[in-house]
């Protein structure tokens, strides 16, 4: 694929999180909903785990189709349930084993930083920033990030242009042609980033559920089988 910004130097590489920096895991969503239900306080309509499962599906479907962001609180609201944030520890404990950073990430980001490339993250998420930062800190990655955007804090989700523009702002780059976006999803990541003028790298690690696949498929500028190979792709573009 020919990239229209070939003469523009690469200044930043922005990564998707789930399925890219963190390997994709198939999880039991019914079990996830039971863990989430542990934060419910008071009475609510019907069986709380089932209602929360349906609410989460609706929230993520809206994110996919309308590119509207959401938070964990929005899932409870959609379910008609009240929750206590201090009781979310069971839900977080459920997810923690699935948040481990890919072993390639630390050396990859370190090499990019040595080369003077800015590094960022753009993640479609309902989780608070603090959770993501704690996971990155646990794995020794947080200090390597120049900026990060978590869509739980902004109005739109990938592939909306505003999400990518916010990520550019976070890493201090104004020209999308100077950015490379790395992700595992052809719609949210590749199509969305290409649409704003970024160069793209697909890391096809994820077996994405059909209900999460968007209506459009993007064409990446490069495809790599592991994150470590992203460095060579970026280096070749910087040398061109």
Language model features with spans:
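Asp-based, Mg2+/Mn2+-dependent phosphohydrolase catalytic module
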Residues: 1-15, 27, 42-47, 106, ...
């Amino acid at each position: 694929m020919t990239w229209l910004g070939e003469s523009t130097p690469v200044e930043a590489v922005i990564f998707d999180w789930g399925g890219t920096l963190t390997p994709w895991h198939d999880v039991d969503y019914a079990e996830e909903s039971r863990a989430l239900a542990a934060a419910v306080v008071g009475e609510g309509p019907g069986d709380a785990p089932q209602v929360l499962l349906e609410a989460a599906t609706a929230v993520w479907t809206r994110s996919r189709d309308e590119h509207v962001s959401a938070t964990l609180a929005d899932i409870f609201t959609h379910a008609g349930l009240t929750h206590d944030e201090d009781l979310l520890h069971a839900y977080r404990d459920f997810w923690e084993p699935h948040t481990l950073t890919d072993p390639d990430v630390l050396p990859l980001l370190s090499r990019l930083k040595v080369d003077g490339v800015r590094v960022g993250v753009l993640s479609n998420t309902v989780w608070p920033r603090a959770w993501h930062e704690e996971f990155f800190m646990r794995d020794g990655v947080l200090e390597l990030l120049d900026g990060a955007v978590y869509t739980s804090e902004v109005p739109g989700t990938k592939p909306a242009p505003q999400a990518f523009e916010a990520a550019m702002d976070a890493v201090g780059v104004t020209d999308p042609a100077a950015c490379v976006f790395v992700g595992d999803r052809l719609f949210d990541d590749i199509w969305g980033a290409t649409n704003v003028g970024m160069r793209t790298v697909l890391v096809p690690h994820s077996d994405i559920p059909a209900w999460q696949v968007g209506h459009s498929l993007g064409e990446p500028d490069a495809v790599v089988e592991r994150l470590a190979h992203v460095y060579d792709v970026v280096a070749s573009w910087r040398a061109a």
